Amino acid sequence: MRAFEFDHHLISSYERFSRSFSSIRSEDLRAAIDAQYDAGRFWPDALLSLNPRYLSGPTVDDLVASGDLDEGTGRVFRFGEKPLRFHRHQAESIAKAKSGKSFVVTTGTGSGKSLCFFVPVVDTIIRALRAGKPRTTRAIIVYPMNALANSQMKEIEKFIGQSGLPDALKPVVKRYTGQESQEERQRIAANPPDILLTNYMMAELLLTRQDDLDAQVVKNATGLEFIILDELH
């Protein structure tokens, strides 16, 4: 698309539309209004924005081949048969997480910040399950709003669902945000998910309300390996 041609076409169309409502006979009034149109007083200037091109990094298959990621993780993070290629900041985040270091990711919208933590979390879970360790809540992700938690849950479940991994190795993701029924809360307490998505208000309630279900959910996170604050700002 030719952006400047489109901008000119859009404004011209809008000008014709706005002029079509009246026919001005007075020459001096028409001249004054024409001057306002010519000065662009009825629409804002074009807003130009440059989208950065993020530095490219290895593919998920590259990290599997180097031993940095489990083969099962390589099956999760793909688009069909095509392996996911990481940006450099994503690969650096994966390396930080594998080293056990805390880190903060600050990068642009649409740059794949969620993969910076989901990839090492999923990899840690798959390795633990492959080693025969019992399921326990190894990661808690705290979101500022339920809508974000809901969309992220759909996204990671889509990746896991298309992986073809056996159920014994598939990470289980559950949501504990206050939207769940009592029955669902009971199931989460009785069968700890590998990844628990919550919001900051529910996270506080888990630590302070301490009814029997909440206490069990917290107990299920004994040995927690990841706590992630999304949209920290």
Feature locations, PLM:
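Conserved Walker A/P-loop ATP-binding site and its immediately adjacent core
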Residues: 115, 136-159, 180, 201-205
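Helicase-associated low-complexity/disordered flanking segments
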Residues: 1-92, 171
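SF2 helicase catalytic motif II
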Residues: 201-205, 210-233
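Conserved RecA-like helicase motor-core motifs
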Residues: 163-179
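Conserved motor-coupling elements within RecA-like helicase/translocase cores
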Residues: 179-196
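Walker A/P-loop NTP-binding motif
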Residues: 95-103, 115-134
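Conserved SF1/SF2 helicase motif Ia
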Residues: 123-152, 165-169, 222
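Short hydrophobic/aromatic beta-strand immediately N-terminal to the Walker A/P-loop
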Residues: 103-106, 140-141
